[in-house]
Amino acid sequence: MGMTVVIILVFSFFVAIVTAETSPYIIHMDLSAKPLPFSDHRSWFSTTLTSVITNRKPKIIYAYTDSVHGFSAVLTNSELQRLKHKPGYVSFTKDLPVKLHTTFSPKFIGLNSTSGTWPVSNYGAGIVIGIIDTGIWPDSPSFHDDGVGSVPSKWKGACEFNSSSLCNKKLIGAKVFNKGLFANNPDLRETKIGQYSSPYDTIGHGTHVAAIAAGNHVKNASYFSYAQGTASGIAPHAHLAIYKAAWEEGIYSSDVIAAIDQAIRDGVHVISLSLGLSFEDDDDNDGFGLENDPIAVASFAAIQKGVFVVTSGGNDGPYYWSLINGAPWIMTVGAGTIGRQFQGTLTFGNRVSFSFPSLFPGEFPSVQFPVTYIESGSVENKTLANRIVVCNENINIGSKLHQIRSTGAAAVVLITDKLLEEQDTIKFQFPVAFIGSKHRETIESYASSNKNNATAKLEFRKTVIGTKPAPEVGTYSSRGPFTSFPQILKPDILAPGTLILSAWPSVEQITGTRALPLFSGFNLLTGTSMAAPHVAGVAALIKQVHPNWSPSAIKSAIMTTALTLDNPLAVGAGHVSTNKVLNPGLIYDTTPQDFINFLCHEAKQSRKLINIITRSNISDACKKPSPYLNYPSIIAYFTSDQSSPKIFKRTLTNVGEAKRSYIVRVRGLKGLNVVVEPKKLMFSEKNEKLSYTVRLESPRGLQENVVYGLVSWVDEDEAEFEVSCSVVATSLVQES
């Protein structure tokens, strides 16, 4: 009997543990429901939380006031269920993990110091760019304040380094957000002093993206002599505010929201986020959609305050529906190449040479080495020391490379077409040359005819400018449509993202081995993470010249002046260009209320989102629902049996000369009947608004899954302006 009792008690204890399992949640509240006796929102949130937690001390992780209205807290499932019945409760989101999207680029997008956007915008002087990432390495010369103006008088931020002297006129704020990290990892402890309390960047990602957006000019920058030159951010005289919310152990929604909340309060003009959700854990939330995306929800509050928000679109390409961060009010950025390659040269003893991609950082003697050619099989029992080993493509690259290296070989040549997609992966610590299989016969012929006397020489650290095609979208760059809101064409724009040189923590090992670590103050990284801060910098330049322009106006100027390239589901409006962004002629402007009106038209899908971002109920928020959003691009969905036309309305605002006429020009859109009315827009004054409609019809069905083109407005007098709107017609259906 005693044994039975023990078993029951143990089982009961186990059940108690399971049912009492806690998780951090983000709770959205309706502030209009706050009872009068409470003096502030935090005290109301705290009392509400206390009323549902009975067996432990309740604790609010964050109370949000600017980006969203609500709080984050650790709750059991039963406590969460009780909270749902409390006055003011709107919805919850589990504190989901977030992931990072991991010299020449300013010139590549049209910036130069003698004329154009840089001098006109005073290099972004007076504009504050907020970077939400892994922190910053303040000692980097990219963050010196030479030539940077005074800190803006309205700035409210703080510098949380141990020494405030680490901040200056360039780096004007740095703050840490780690409460969500600790709530999700309660056993986490600091293993070194200041590990989780300092804005110092020990990962490198945040330093890299901050310097892309607004790093100062640094001469003689390079990655081990690759990409050598003067490094500069896109807005080198803008100020930087750093919000460290990303950690090696994880990134959490609650910390990201708190960082956006603080950035709005501090007074930033631009927010750059090179991170985002994957929604892999949507079963833990109240449904699937934008309402569960912390960046989407919090950034809406930012644009309401006039803050421009730019995000990376993700690195899960080249597949359709892989894009993230696609809320209509966010600028979503894809990544492309910049016409620059890093190479090595392989020269055989017969003087036949081959170029190959390489970022080998070490020194390598420029002399002829004896060559051993291996057709296949093991390298064991072969004398390879101080030789260049040439292997065929049927060799397993990873394991054989390790074996060959252990033999003391000087270098390896791999004859293969299986180059890894992201060029970042050519950062081998051992000298390796990838040569295409089309050259196999030439190499085999030389090696076989000179079996005992074949030699070769390898040379590294070569940078080649002007390679084609460029710009070209990276295969890794995520493609639209955006799963959570496919009604808007995404991404918005393409920017440089492949092997971008930028600042790096000089004490963090960048490559090499444990025995021979290598360090550098600059690094070459690839990803949409690198593309987003390019656009953040461009937005800062525009904001400096047009301080009263809305976030939508800035977005429009960037999109309508882009260099059109390819499928907009991959490149958006095209590649960012700064040649005309300060004077686009016409803009598509949109107010926060316009976004709400459009969401209201999609009320079935967006009801909870509307409630969260408007802090009111549907009937109050949705008095003027609209099927149209004045966006600088168009996407239309057609099914195989659908012939009814799709109609879109757009409104252009004249920001150019007072009197100017524009005529419409339609390009592409093969197989579609396209009617634009009117065909001419005649503006008589500055800031005048004129509207037009686009009618798309597919009488015989789409010839391809994706058909695209442009509707452009060209001024008829001087052809100085061409204001382009990308248009996509598609039969793509999202997989369930």
Swiss-Prot record:
Pfam families: fn3_6, Inhibitor_I9, Peptidase_S8. One of its GO terms (molecular function) is serine-type endopeptidase activity. It comes from Arabidopsis thaliana. InterPro entries: Peptidase_S8/S53_dom (IPR000209), Peptidase_S8/S53_dom_sf (IPR036852), Peptidase_S8_Asp-AS (IPR023827), Peptidase_S8_Ser-AS (IPR023828), Peptidase_S8_subtilisin-rel (IPR015500), Peptidases_S8_3 (IPR034197), S8pro/Inhibitor_I9 (IPR010259), S8pro/Inhibitor_I9_sf (IPR037045). Residues 1-20 form the signal peptide. Belongs to the peptidase S8 family. It is found in: Secreted. GO terms for cellular component: extracellular region. Residues 103-582 form the Peptidase S8 domain. Residues 21-101 form a propeptide. Residues 25-101 form the Inhibitor I9 domain. The keyword Signal applies. This is Subtilisin-like protease SBT1.9. The active site is at 133 (charge relay system), 205 (charge relay system), 529 (charge relay system). Its EC number is 3.4.21.-. CDD domains: Peptidases_S8_3 (cd04852). Gene3D superfamilies: 2.60.40.2310, 3.50.30.30, Peptidase S8 propeptide/proteinase inhibitor I9, Peptidase S8/S53 domain. GO terms for biological process: proteolysis. Keywords: Autocatalytic cleavage, Glycoprotein, Hydrolase, Protease, Secreted, Serine protease, Signal, Zymogen. It is an enzyme of class 3 (hydrolase). Residues 367-441 form the PA domain. Coiled coil: none annotated. Glycans are attached at residues 112, 162, 220, 381, 453, 617.
